[in-house]
Structures are given as C-alpha cells and as structure tokens.
Amino acid sequence: MKSTFAALLIMVGCLVSGALLTGSEAAAAQPVTLNYANFPPASTFPCIQMEQWAHEVRTRTRGKVDVLTYPGGTLLGARNMLRGVMSGQADIGCISLAYHPGVFPVMSVFELPLGFTSAEAASSVLWELYSGLRPAELERVKVLTMFTSAPSHFMTVTPVRSLRDLQGMEIRGAGTLSAILEKLGATPVSMPMPEVPEAVQKGIIKGLFTSLDVMKDMNFAEMTGHVTRADQAVYPFAVIMNREAWERLSPDVQQVLDGLAAEHAAWTGRYLDAHVQDSMRWAEEKHGVQVHTLPEEDIAAMRRSVQPLFDAWAQRAADKGADPDAVMRTVDALKAQYGG
C-alpha cells in the first residue's frame, strides 16, 4: 500500500513539474510587446524611422519583441508625448525637443543654426553629443536614438526673394526656429506640424520654416508655391522609452536596442537627405514650385542676426549648471568629424 501511494506521489510530482516547466517555457516564448507612439502623419520621416526601427527590433530579437506602432497622434500627440511616455501611456515615443522649451537646456543647442547642410551628419553628431554628455535633462527616460530634420528653408505662399519680403510675414516655426524668424523680421507662429496645413489653407499663416521633405509628405507643394533656400537650423528629435518598461526587458534585448542607436541616427539622416531631393523634384515637376536663393548680403545679415540666440542659449545652459563652451567645442569637433 505504501509503495503504491509513493508511486502515485512521484507520478503527480512529475506531472506538476512538467506542467510548470511547460508554463515557464511558454512564458519565455511569449514575445514582449512594446507600444511606440508618434505624432506626425505616417508618411513623414519620423514615422518612416519608427517603422524601420520596429522591423529591425523584431528581426534582431528573433521575435522576442514585437513593436506596435501608432503614427499620427493615434496614441499620444505632440504636446503630451513626453509626459505620456514618462507616465507609461506608451512604452516608446518620439519627441521633438523644440516642442518643449526650457526642458532640454543642453541638447537644445541643436536648435541653433549650427551650419549643417545634411541630415545624416547632423543626426550622427546629435547622437554622439548625447552619448558623450548624457545630460541630466534626459535621465528620467531611456533614450533609444536621436536624429534631426534636414536643414530648414522657407516654404511660402508668396515669393521670398530677400529678407525684406519676410518682414511681418506669419511663418510657422517651433522652438529656437521661432526665435530665428523673429530675428529676421518675420512674425513667428508656433503650432504642432499636424495643425499647419489647415492654418496655411485658412490664411492664418503664410508659410513655414522647416525641412523640405514636407513638401511631398504633407503636400505643402500644393499650398506653398515658393521655396527660399536658407540652410538654417535643424529640428532635433529623440526616441525615448519609459524607464520601467526598459528595465523589464532582458539584458540581451536591451543590448539589441542599444546596438541600434547610432546606426539608426545615421540611417534616418541618410533616408531624409535622399527623400528631400525626391520631394523637391516632385514639387517642382508636378506643382511648379519655384525655388529662390537669397542674395549674399542677406545670408551674411542672417548670420549676424542670429548670433544673440547663441549667447542666450549659452546663458540658459550655464544657469542649469552646464558648460556651454565645452558643449559647443564638442559640437564643433564632432561636426568636423562627420562633415556638414
């Protein structure tokens, strides 16, 4: 009787342990799902980057991680993206630093007209600057990668052939680019990019000051028939992750995500540089958009006009305990390394 009872106990124990093993294996095989929120339309470069990054994560983790993407403000909008990721409404989000004035005193150096002519160089320098400095302003989130827009130009309803034509013109800009517009005599109007097409169509603004990919991606070629080349500042972006969501990931998955950071900064810039050229060809050929170049004396005047913005940034950074001279030296060294 005792031997029969013992045999039953062994059998039950084997069944239970087998069930537990199967359950743990099933749990281990279950992919982690991450929500990635973005605010501009799906056709724009931050969302193209999002989809490419999600694909790479799925592939390189061999299915351990799935990424659900939410473009066009379907999960979080531009104004609440930072807060939403920090509170866990989304695991991952893309933020435009320009939409958060005063929050990023060090990294907002990238809103200044630093002289970049390529998004690839600007994006790589931005990521290297962050990686080297790790400023406290971003320590509450995990930064997965950073990248920039292409250099900013004027897209306007009426032609801008000189700085005189800009005087008093209502132009959309964000962050420091609004301040650049003001220094040049325009009337800056700040609003998230998804609101801009309607504002142009209603005549609330007469144009925008940003990179030329939106001529095609957001169909501004139909609304603004003129482009004035200015090669002004870029817009910096950061892909951020909720800290608790990051810490829940296994070390091997964290390693994959970290390995994508510099690679994706360069990939996004490279994609954008090619796409800007494509967008402008399309805008000129299909919509007859006219391209204007400012006179040399106006270009020199622009450089002089924006110098106070560098001084103001340096003061804000110093007030937050940063060394603005060291930051600018690092930017200059990295810019020389990666080219303009």
UniProtKB/Swiss-Prot annotation:
**Could you tell me where this protein is found in the cell?**
Periplasm
Pfam families xref list: DctP
Protein residues bound to (indol-3-yl)acetate? Y99, R172, T210, S211, L212, D213, Y235
Q: Give the principal location in a single coarse category.
A: periplasm
Q: Which residues form the signal peptide?
A: 1-29
UniProt superkingdom? Bacteria
User: Which keywords appear in this protein's UniProt record, sorted alphabetically?
Assistant: Periplasm, Signal, Transport
- The answer to whether the entry has keyword Transport is yes
Q: Name one GO biological process term.
A: transmembrane transport
Query: Cellular component per GO?
Result: periplasmic space
Q: Where are the transmembrane segments?
A: none
Describe the task this protein carries out.
Answer: Solute-binding protein that binds indole-3-pyruvate and indole-3-acetate (in vitro). Can also bind D-tryptophan (in vitro), but that is probably not a physiological ligand. Probably part of a tripartite ATP-independent periplasmic (TRAP) transport system that mediates solute transport into the cytoplasm.
Query: According to its UniProt record, which protein family does this protein belong to?
Result: Belongs to the bacterial solute-binding protein 7 family.
- Its quaternary structure? The complex is comprised of an extracytoplasmic solute-binding protein and a heteromeric permease formed by two transmembrane proteins.
Q: Which NCBIfam families match?
A: TRAP_S1 (NF037995)
PANTHER family hit by this protein: BLL6794 PROTEIN (PTHR33376:SF15), PTHR33376
What this protein is called in its record is Solute-binding protein Dde_0634
Protein source organism: Oleidesulfovibrio alaskensis (strain ATCC BAA-1058 / DSM 17464 / G20)
